[in-house]
């Protein structure tokens, strides 16, 4: 409502404040992946996370294709056409709230707190790597987010600057977004089967390959840039699913929600830093250098996840 009012009144301050509040919905949407894992056994936890992640793809694809029809709806109501999507999203948020209040009972997080701690009564997933802890999980997702946002943000600008149309740039981004979420069921199976650490390393390698491909792609090659962005999305997916599973495994149930919230704040800040700094980097040293720098950052995930947390013993 605030965004629509800001658009109608041509009030930038109101619009910005409303958009900040609107962002809370996106944060809740991302947090939903943790809720999917609250009651999952360790052996199926990553698959539970991935199921929620792939559901967000449906909304993303549908929303991206509603711009024109919702614009017609807004115009019919005497509102600016671009407010149409916010009319629909407001209704969708309200419906989601009703679903949560009516059907999410009992709250899976509260129910999980009444169950025995992980490792006592519940089976441990093969390859769960208990040496990994919360800091590693946060670092995996943080570096993944920084690399993905930085390269993704500047790729359309790079394409437009070299003569490609908005249609080509839009197609590349659409393929990228699809690769971010559609592989989630497969990612969940891989994480549960081969372990959090292995797929986190796979995320780093995939992101690095994507970065090298983006840096070396000829300026007139939409196909290679699209392939680079697809791999970038896939690497992000691997990192997000494995990092989420690492954190959920390591955090005690009593403090898990706080830990998960802290992780997502770090991810959001990292994404903002990656997005804002990417433009300055491209202006200073170019898009290929930005991509290669992103690849180096991604490879920092490997030593982070291969380093086990030191165990302390008491005599």
What are these regions (language model features)?
Residues 1-9, 206-219:
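C-terminal ends and interior cores of transmembrane alpha-helices
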Residues 12-27, 224-238:
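Hydrophobic core of transmembrane alpha-helices in multi-pass small-molecule transporters
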Residues 20, 130-151, 230:
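Pair of pore-lining "gating" transmembrane helices in MFS-fold secondary transporters
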Residues 27-41, 238-251:
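Intracellular juxtamembrane helix-capping segments at the cytosolic ends
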Residues 48-67, 266-274:
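Glycine-rich segments within core transmembrane alpha-helices of 12-TM secondary carriers
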Residues 67-68, 72, 90-115, 304-308:
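C-terminal membrane-cytosol helix-exit motif in multi-pass small-molecule transporters
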Residues 105-140:
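Juxtamembrane intracellular "pre-TM" segments in multi-pass secondary transporters
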Residues 183-196, 282:
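Helix-to-loop junctions at the C-terminal end of transmembrane segments
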């Amino acid at each position: 409502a605030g965004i629509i009012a800001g658009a109608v009144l041509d009030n930038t301050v109101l619009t910005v404040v409303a958009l900040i509040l609107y962002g809370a919905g996106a944060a809740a949407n991302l947090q939903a992946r943790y809720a999917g894992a609250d009651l999952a056994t360790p052996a199926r936890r990553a698959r539970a996370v991935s199921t929620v992640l792939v559901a967000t793809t449906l909304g993303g694809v549908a929303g991206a294709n509603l711009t024109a029809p919702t614009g017609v709806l807004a115009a019919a109501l005497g509102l600016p056409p671009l407010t149409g999507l916010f009319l629909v999203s407001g209704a969708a948020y309200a419906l989601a709230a009703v679903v949560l209040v009516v059907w999410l009972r009992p709250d899976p997080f509260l129910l999980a707190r009444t169950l025995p701690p992980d490792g006592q009564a519940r089976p441990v997933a093969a390859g769960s790597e208990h040496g990994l802890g919360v800091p590693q999980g946060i670092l995996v997702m943080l570096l993944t987010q920084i690399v993905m946002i930085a390269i993704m943000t500047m790729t359309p600008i790079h394409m437009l600057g070299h003569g490609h149309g908005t249609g080509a740039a839009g197609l590349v981004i659409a393929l990228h977004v699809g690769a971010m979420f559609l592989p989630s069921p497969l990612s969940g199976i891989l994480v549960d089967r081969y372990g959090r650490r292995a797929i986190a390393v796979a995320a780093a390698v995939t992101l690095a390959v994507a970065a090298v491909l983006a840096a070396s792609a000829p300026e007139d090659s939409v196909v290679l840039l699209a392939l680079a962005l697809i791999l970038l999305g896939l690497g992000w997916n691997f990192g997000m699913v494995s990092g989420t599973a690492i954190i959920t495994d390591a955090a005690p149930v009593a403090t898990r929600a706080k830990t998960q919230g802290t992780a997502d704040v770090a991810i959001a800040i990292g994404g903002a830093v990656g997005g804002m700094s990417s433009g300055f980097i491209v202006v200073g040293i170019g898009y290929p250098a930005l991509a290669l720098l992103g690849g180096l950052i991604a490879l920092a995930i490997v030593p982070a996840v291969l380093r086990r947390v030191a165990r302390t013993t008491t005599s």
